[in-house]
Amino acid sequence: MGKGSEDLVKKESLNSTPVNSDTFPAWAKDVAECEEHFVVSREKGLSSDEVLKRHQIYGLNELEKPEGTSIFKLILEQFNDTLVRILLAAAVISFVLAFFDGDEGGEMGITAFVEPLVIFLILIVNAIVGIWQETNAEKALEALKEIQSQQATVMRDGTKVSSLPAKELVPGDIVELRVGDKVPADMRVVALISSTLRVEQGSLTGESEAVSKTTKHVDENADIQGKKCMVFAGTTVVNGNCICLVTDTGMNTEIGRVHSQIQEAAQHEEDTPLKKKLNEFGEVLTMIIGLICALVWLINVKYFLSWEYVDGWPRNFKFSFEKCTYYFEIAVALAVAAIPEGLPAVITTCLALGTRKMAQKNALVRKLPSVETLGCTTVICSDKTGTLTTNQMAVSKLVAMGSRIGTLRSFNVEGTSFDPRDGKIEDWPMGRMDANLQMIAKIAAICNDANVEQSDQQFVSRGMPTEAALKVLVEKMGFPEGLNEASSDGDVLRCCRLWSELEQRIATLEFDRDRKSMGVMVDSSSGNKLLLVKGAVENVLERSTHIQLLDGSKRELDQYSRDLILQSLRDMSLSALRCLGFAYSDVPSDFATYDGSEDHPAHQQLLNPSNYSSIESNLIFVGFVGLRDPPRKEVRQAIADCRTAGIRVMVITGDNKSTAEAICREIGVFEADEDISSRSLTGIEFMDVQDQKNHLRQTGGLLFSRAEPKHKQEIVRLLKEDGEVVAMTGDGVNDAPALKLADIGVAMGISGTEVAKEASDMVLADDNFSTIVAAVGEGRSIYNNMKAFIRYMISSNIGEVASIFLTAALGIPEGMIPVQLLWVNLVTDGPPATALGFNPPDKDIMKKPPRRSDDSLITAWILFRYMVIGLYVGVATVGVFIIWYTHSSFMGIDLSQDGHSLVSYSQLAHWGQCSSWEGFKVSPFTAGSQTFSFDSNPCDYFQQGKIKASTLSLSVLVAIEMFNSLNALSEDGSLVTMPPWVNPWLLLAMAVSFGLHFVILYVPFLAQVFGIVPLSLNEWLLVLAVSLPVILIDEVLKFVGRCTSGYRYSPRTLSTKQKEE
């Protein structure tokens, strides 16, 4: 090994880090300097010994796999939630108390264990779902590996090694790339084998066209798109062959940096706005539960702890462990009542229903919380290529020669895809093409190596998209003499095939970057041999001496015609059209008898590309076309809808500035005549802006062109720091880090890479930007419905807490046991709450500005309303309990038919002193087929005997909550204007909940488990009489709400318009 090689190894060993583009800018050095730096020659490549040494330094050429989170840690993370911790504590305490449960607890046998077991089951299911989601979260990194090349052709020890595993490449390796190859590492182009080399790197950079590569070095500060002498791992060679030198491998490649950025973004994922609100609610709930439990405990201390005062000091303490345990159980019941156990399940169900609705609109949600987050999206950062545009090149204008010198004809071409049936040519002489138009069609069809195929109802290009667009144009032009009507089932390119049959192609003059044109020689059916040329308009025009007029006649190309063509070209370029010119001539005399044979003397001229310019001279110019990556038809209206909905649209693309600006003006991001100098920046220009956040706060649209992955990620990060809720769309590898970092990552389903899809929260099945806007509307509707059922469930829980608190405060026996409350929270409340998710959306839902992510889920007014409703629930449930014990009738309803004994309210409130009452006796009473008697212990009337009163309390609670679900149909709208049948699912859900309640009432085994008994008709009338007033109360509150809405919302509206600095 030479001294230079020894120095290199020594240097690398000292640094112990790979040489990468940060330490050696290979793109800014000439080929000789690169070979010298990596101590290699392109003729011999690296030696086997050198490869082994570099493997030890650089490792394998593959992306790192991050260490997965252990299953134990994943399980623990599922309990990192306030509500879950409260539930877990309640379950543990309930389980312990079940062992000490006695007669005073009111529960028997299995009933005592139902509550903790059900809570544990809820927690287990919740943990399983959470772990499943976590283990599926990092597939983006695996998908990234799939786009890496598997094999490479390498020069080692002076010998060409085919199919070497790409992971064995090291910096300094000499690699040969051929058309169709996937680039295995970041490499410096050191020699071109073909006359030209083009690489499709749009998935990495966002460019809409394949990029020509060269061996010439570029500026050291060039961005990815500007590194014309570099090819990058994961991109594809679409034209030409070359020799390259590996400069970076594995995690040091551009795709490796994307991998690192995805990992970094995954570590900074934040909770959704709803999750944050629920966590805040859980923390507040914890404090409230703690305070109320402590208060209940203090209120009832007198029942299990008493003392006498002797000489002013407390003496002779008496403590009852059974009663202490009993009141502790009441405190636990209070906790169970306060926690909306069914809320997580109902939220998940509502979000799942939302995903189904969105799927019907072609928005496939991968992560459930994204459904709700969409509703508060304030900024949509959209990629241009493939998202706002079709990513399918299409001809939009055709310019042909006129009937005389100095005249041009212009035709607008419709269509935005590779489907030949998509659009037509305006004012086109179908079947009556003149000679000039026929020649344009002939050149576009034959001087062309692309193909268009139909696959799964989609038309896709094979080869260069620009050439595929030309073939689609030929199909729209039709064929002369009525042959365009000829049937050819399944032939997508019918006209192109017919032209190819008439004009047999015998030689190809490949495109190169010097002359910027491609030519073909054809043996025409007319007996002549022609040279057909297409290329950059200026270059083709420069080599032309004549023009062809409408009737096919030739005229000398004068200066006026030349200037006219160039002016038309400039006008089209201002519209960001890429223009291609067409010309033809008779073949040079040397090729007059050429038939494509290698033995022909003229064939030698075709082997040397330097001859092509002279062959393609003295041309006859026939016309030119303007192509572009056209915007999607629906995008302009979708952006207008975003503006109406208060959502800002920012376009972030890797494409060049002029093209991006033209598209943005066309789709409505900018007005046609708007000054956008302060709104349109390149990625590098934005990074140099001093106050970046202030730039991003500008109202209206913004554009960032030539943006690299790091720029996209930085823009998303800054927007999130500024309090925006960001939806980021994209389809390429370059979009993946920003998709992962954004609040909502939206990937394209058709054109999107697997990397982008796996990094996203939502996939658009139709690749349509307007689908995002529809999904935002659906997200807002879902959020409104979620507010309805969250408030409904919380008001129910407030009612349960009020019921238990009043019971404890009044000193009467416990009205409802924990297992009954658990049943109500989980089962009875579930169907109505879920059905509220089907509430129809407001008609003006997309005409309102987005809610702020920190907007309160429950305002002070809403809390007051539900405190009032909750207090009524508590009064009603406790009241019906007292009524059964103390009244033989209520509002004309006879309650004495079961034969139960009446007691005074004072006796009920001091039931713990029953054993000291003289002559206290009670009669037996019936409940269904059961008879309850208390001859042996009359005081059991307040424990075992409370079963009927407890059933009435539970039934009133269920009935009130069913009627209260009707109140939740609208926040302030009366049931008169929004009747129950606007949501038939709610009526069905109420029937289901009542049905479930009847099941536990009238099925003996279940009635025993829940500690309840059947009710008579009169008792049901009492339940309804006590329950129905909840509708009237809430109607009054809604009326007050409507009357004061202006006062309550005007300050809020002003505050939302003020951005926090």
UniProtKB/Swiss-Prot annotation:
Its EC number is 7.2.2.10. It is a multi-pass membrane protein. Residues 1-70, 136-278, 346-786, 838-857, 971-983, 1039-1061 are cytoplasmic. Keywords: ATP-binding, Calcium, Calcium transport, Endoplasmic reticulum, Ion transport, Magnesium, Manganese, Membrane, Metal-binding, Nucleotide-binding, Translocase, Transmembrane, Transmembrane helix, Transport. The active site is at 383 (4-aspartylphosphate intermediate). GO terms for molecular function: ATP binding; ATP hydrolysis activity; metal ion binding; P-type calcium transporter activity. It is an enzyme of class 7 (translocase). The keyword Ribonucleoprotein does not apply. Ca(2+) 2 binds at residues 336-337, 339, 341, 825, 829. It is found in: Endoplasmic reticulum membrane. Gene3D superfamilies: Calcium-transporting ATPase, cytoplasmic domain N, Calcium-transporting ATPase, cytoplasmic transduction domain A, Calcium-transporting ATPase, transmembrane domain, HAD superfamily/HAD-like. It comes from the Eukaryota. It holds the Pfam family Cation_ATPase_C. Belongs to the cation transport ATPase (P-type) (TC 3.A.3) family. Type IIA subfamily. This magnesium-dependent enzyme catalyzes the hydrolysis of ATP coupled with the translocation of calcium from the cytosol to the endoplasmic reticulum lumen. Also regulates manganese ion homeostasis by pumping it into endomembrane compartments. Can also transport zinc. This is Calcium-transporting ATPase 1, endoplasmic reticulum-type. It comes from Arabidopsis thaliana.
